[in-house]
């Protein structure tokens, strides 16, 4: 019988660790937290030092029973949850719930799941760090107070089922403020001027850009006219050596950003894949602020570079953490075995591991050495100059392995752009000059990676909170990830060639964006309400200062109860005051004007199922009319005219095959109705302008698709149909589907054959349901 019980957080980790320890050790998993604050209750005793009231969830009770039984049998219980604050709290909850004693309990931590790391942890146990536990407890209690106190105010003032949170609401604020910046942005016109010139000996022309933007078409035309007979010569020539240094090893946030840019992963996806890599023993702990690498890792990296690339590619480097309150772990994210260039696993795991491996190796590699040539080209009779630049990689250094990406990938840093051999004073011949109309770009919307970077810059949240925060604001429909179509402009192109200026036009779109975070109407309204009535909670500095206070608690400098008390005494009265405040209109409601036909008030607001327009007053005897906003319309900028058009629906288009054809808008968008058939109206057509012919075309297409889908019906049993589906032919009967055996000809089946298949399926033994136990999410 094993004398030692080791408890880790996840079953995958348990399996890996069990391989390293002998028969004297039994490894079990707690599947994350074994107890938490009660879900539906406030669960904080305000009268007694804000003591949290914990419960063991129903789905954890059997597990706790098993852990208690095994702990009783063991001589020593090793609590091996993660070393961050969340992991420390899990260890403390296990200690409390299992009724452990200091004599038989040891706390161990490790940053990688390797045999040497596990054995070292066993040799160097410690006690539970109660200060770290208190810091986690303070975060949990404060977030519960904010959520439980603010959410009912939102239900009362805006609509039911809304929620607020200390970090999530500030993240939404960032996205809303960026959207408002974009809305208020006024694009300014300018002309970008580029020349192609050549020397007598060069095979390729030199591309040079004018050193200033021209403000208008008139200025561009005047400039090109002056260049018709101008002389172009090299007025200055500089050659400078450049060095590029590698980026630091990955922290949680930089891994999330780089995986988003290079691999297209979401922040949550990155953390999920990294968790699997860690639990399989492939990488070190993935929640960390640190850029430090252990001396053992540095030694193996040096050996790897020297062996595979040679000594000239190696350069020892030490990196220092600059993040505020870095505390999550003591080492950066790196491969556990540097010699493992590749791993087995899923495609996602392989790609993320490859990214981590290359970044880690690059951190200890030599600088890339480049040579940058800049040529200034004077224009006879003008003050402006053309500038040509060329960059040549003399020694690739770390670029041999890895190049860090940026949010703006317009310049390819790895490109090798050479200039021909030039001399100062040399005259150049002109091939052509292009003056292209351009417009200044609006600020970009946040991608997930950009939002993580911004939150980290502001000191909001910690490595364990970035992914859950971004998931939460999307799950609660405050923010959606999507694309925005830009503004179309007719671009003027002016070309000077062979002494003549030619003008052409082309259409370009500015501001197109994909996979960006966009606030919903509900998100905008909730943000504006919280900004007006709870500015302290929404203040970036407040949220960052709270994180610092948690750090002080973790370091034992302050008592967690005192910090909570200081906050609650100011916050709670403010909540009560705002909750009781009488508002003239529901928050987010906006009066647009009066309907000229009826004289009734027209307003827009957030309804139970989303944004809508209202015709008539709620207080009047006559029931008001409601219409949902269409995709692309917003509570903040819909006009009276646009709102009134929504009340034109449903609209009768005419008759087709003896039945009326109408168009209307439902919860899922605009649709055409013909008898019992409903057909969605595509984005290319508007429900306000769709014609009968266009609607009939949609009806015919759907009828044709239905015809192909329908294999057979039975007059004696109208509810029974044989249908074609994406996974093959099947029987549909009373809202249930039944698979047709492969050896049966579906078209030849009789009603009795179908009944026999249904009866056989009903009598077949039920397959046991697979239950997947999940680790509790860290908050």
For each predicted feature, which ranges?
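Basic, low-complexity terminal or inter-domain segments flanking catalytic cores
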Residues: 2-5, 16, 25, 151, ...
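Short, polar/flexible loop-turn hinges at active-site or ligand-entry regions and domain interfaces
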Residues: 53, 81-83, 101-106, 125-133, ...
């Amino acid at each position: 019988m094993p004398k030692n019980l080791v408890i880790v957080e996840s079953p995958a980790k348990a399996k890996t660790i069990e391989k390293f320890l002998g028969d004297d050790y039994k490894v079990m998993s707690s599947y994350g937290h074994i107890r938490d604050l009660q879900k539906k209750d406030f669960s904080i005793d305000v009268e007694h030092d804000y003591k949290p009231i914990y419960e063991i969830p129903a789905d954890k009770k059997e597990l706790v029973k098993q852990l208690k039984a095994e702990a009783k049998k063991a001589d020593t219980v090793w609590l091996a949850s993660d070393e961050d604050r969340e992991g420390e709290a899990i260890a403390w909850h296990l200690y409390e719930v299992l009724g452990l004693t200091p004599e038989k309990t040891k706390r161990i931590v490790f940053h990688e799941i390797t045999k040497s790391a596990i054995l070292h942890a066993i040799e160097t146990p410690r006690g539970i760090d109660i200060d770290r536990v208190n810091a986690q407890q303070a975060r949990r209690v404060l977030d519960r107070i904010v959520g439980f106190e603010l959410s009912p105010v939102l239900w009362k003032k805006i609509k039911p089922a809304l929620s607020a949170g200390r970090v999530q609401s500030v993240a939404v604020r960032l996205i809303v403020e960026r959207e408002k910046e974009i809305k208020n942005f006024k694009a300014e016109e300018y002309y970008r001027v580029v020349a192609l010139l050549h020397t007598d000996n060069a095979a390729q022309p030199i591309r040079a850009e004018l050193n200033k933007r021209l403000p208008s078409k008139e200025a561009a035309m005047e400039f090109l006219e002056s260049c018709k007979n101008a002389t172009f010569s090299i007025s200055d020539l500089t050659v400078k050596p450049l060095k590029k240094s590698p980026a630091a090893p990955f922290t949680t946030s930089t891994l999330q950003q780089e995986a988003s840019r290079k691999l297209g992963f979401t922040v949550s996806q990155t953390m999920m894949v990294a968790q699997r890599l860690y639990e399989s023993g492939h990488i070190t702990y993935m929640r960390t602020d640190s850029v430090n690498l252990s001396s053992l890792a540095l030694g193996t990296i040096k050996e790897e570079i020297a062996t595979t690339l040679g000594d000239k590619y190696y350069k020892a480097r030490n990196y220092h953490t600059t993040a505020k309150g870095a505390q999550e772990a003591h080492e950066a994210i790196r491969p556990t075995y540097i010699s493992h260039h590749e791993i087995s696993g899923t495609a996602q795991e392989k790609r993320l591991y490859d990214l981590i491996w290359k970044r880690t190796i690059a951190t200890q590699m030599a600088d890339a050495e480049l040579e940058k040539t800049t040529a200034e080209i004077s224009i006879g009779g003008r003050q402006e100059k053309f500038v040509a630049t060329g960059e040549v990689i003399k020694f690739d250094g770390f670029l041999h392995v890895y190049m860090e990406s940026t949010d703006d990938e317009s310049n390819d840093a790895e490109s090798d752009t050479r200039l021909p051999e030039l001399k100062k004073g040399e005259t150049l011949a002109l091939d052509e000059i292009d003056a292209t109309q351009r417009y200044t770009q609006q600020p970009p919307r946040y991608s997930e990676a950009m939002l993580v970077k911004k939150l980290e810059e502001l000191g909001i949240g910690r490595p364990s909170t970035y992914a859950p925060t971004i998931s939460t604001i999307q799950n609660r429909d405050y923010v959606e990830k999507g694309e925005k179509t830009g503004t179309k402009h007719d671009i003027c192109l002016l070309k000077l060639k062979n002494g003549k200026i030619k003008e052409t036009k082309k259409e370009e779109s500015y501001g197109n964006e994909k996979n960006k975070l966009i606030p919903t109407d509900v998100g905008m309204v909730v943000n504006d309400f919280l900004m007006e009535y709870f500015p302290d909670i929404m203040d970036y500095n407040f949220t960052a200062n709270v994180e610092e206070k948690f750090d002080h608690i973790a370091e034992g400098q302050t008592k967690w109860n005192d910090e909570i008390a200081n906050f609650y005494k100011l916050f709670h009265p403010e909540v009560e005051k705002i909750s009781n405040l009488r508002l003239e209109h529901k928050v987010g409601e906006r009066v647009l004007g009066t309907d000229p036909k009826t004289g009734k008030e027209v307003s827009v607001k957030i309804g139970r199922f989303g944004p809508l327009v209202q015709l008539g007053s709620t207080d009047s005897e006559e029931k008001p009319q409601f219409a949902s906003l269409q995709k692309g319309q917003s509570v903040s900028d819909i006009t009276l005219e646009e709102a009134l058009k929504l009340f034109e629906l449903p609209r009768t288009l005419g008759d087709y095959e003896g039945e009326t054809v109408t168009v209307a808008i439902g919860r899922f968008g605009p649709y055409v109705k013909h008898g019992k058939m409903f057909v969605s109206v595509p984005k290319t057509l508007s429900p306000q302008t769709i014609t009968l012919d266009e609607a009939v075309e949609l009806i015919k297409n759907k009828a044709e698709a239905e015809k192909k889908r329908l294999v057979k019906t039975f007059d004696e049993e109208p509810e029974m149909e044989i249908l074609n589906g994406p996974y093959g032919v099947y029987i549909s009967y009373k809202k249930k589907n039944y698979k047709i055996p492969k050896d049966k000809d579906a078209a030849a089946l009789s009603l009795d054959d179908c009944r026999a298949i249904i009866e056989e399926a009903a009598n077949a033994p039920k397959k046991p349901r697979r239950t997947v136990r999940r680790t509790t999410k860290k908050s």
